[in-house]
Amino acid sequence: DEIDEVFYIIRKIKELISKGVPYKDIAILYRTNAQSRVFEQELLKQNIPFRIVGSFYFYSRKEIKDLLAYLRLILNSDDDISLTRCINTPKRGIGPKTISEIEANANTYNTSMYEAIKDGKALDFKKVIEELKEDLKSCTLTEFIDKVLDKSGMRNALKEEKSLEADIRLENLEEFKSVTKNFEERVGIISLEEFLTEISLVSDIEEYKDDPNRITLMTVHSVKGLEYPYVFLAGLEEGIFPHRNCYSKDELEEERRLMYVAITRAMKKLWITCTKKRMIYGQESPSILSRFVREIDPDLIDGETKEEPKPVKKEKRIYKEDRVFNYGDKVHHETYGDGVVIEVTNTILTVAFNKDIGIKKILKNHKSIRRV
């Protein structure tokens, strides 16, 4: 999958570095901005210096910051900074004057800006937030992100914009669901608070501004005119490269031209990678090798398809089969110990643990939870 792909590329990078190749001689290219997230995440974990050219870090992109502002406000209504960021995103007729009046009322009555909202369009916004707070009680984080994108109007506003910039932003927002899905599968709990705590560790990336020796990450659109001794071209799968939105003959020819540009950026060696399956927008789907790879003369390719040693990954933590739990069942959780089921939905268990841990929402089919 996409994690194996990143591990493979990082392993090859480390081999190059061990032979004396500087980081600055290496580039990782991809078709869509949304693909950068998993590379950022793993390079950061392994303390490998990198920069992104032609875009921002995933968590520094405006639309992702806007979404995080919604999530933080839903979790904590006293967060005035998050409220100020998202109250008029997308535009809903709440201008600077209204926001200043809300802030003044909050200061007068020594309360949060959220509590100071009493009428007008701001009250409509507040009702949306209250509705989303209720939604959070009964769905997974990935399902919840969909509800936030819909009820906030963010998704629809970007669709209506009908521009390449809007399409890219929407792709990034949809990719955020892969972040929540990975979190759920790894830890098994439905906790917006714990999710945001984890995200905060990677969302405030300090750029290696003073270090000229760093790997370059960029889309194939941004690489025109640049060359690197060693290039990794990732995600060569149908629907990614060529892009899923390219239907006409002319659009496919433009994608093919981009592929040529990407391939010819490598001065010494080029790696082309693809996956057998990939998490896209929170859904895992089988991958089909890009037609562009199949069009390359096989004699020019030195392929690697066998399993190679790689960093140990945690096993999949979700059972495919549905497991039956009932109200009152005694259960044991790997981390939280013994507890009692106090609510059951299609996908979520609400479990009361001891007073130090309290009540937790847990994915019903996660391996961390079992009946006792």
Segments and roles (model prediction):
Residues 303-332:
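Mixed-charge, Lys/Arg-rich low-complexity intrinsically disordered regions
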Residues 344-349:
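Short, conserved beta-turn/loop elements at beta-strand boundaries and strand-helix junctions
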Residues 331, 339-341:
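Conserved hydrophobic positions within beta-strands
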Residues 219, 342-343:
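A residue-level detector for short acidic-glycine micro-motifs
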Residues 241, 350-369:
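A short macromolecule-binding patch
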Residues 47-57, 362:
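Conserved RecA-like helicase motor-core motifs
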Residues 22, 36-48, 61, 68-300:
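Conserved helicase C-terminal RecA-like lobe
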Residues 1-49, 74-76, 136, 319-322:
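Helicase P-loop NTPase motor core
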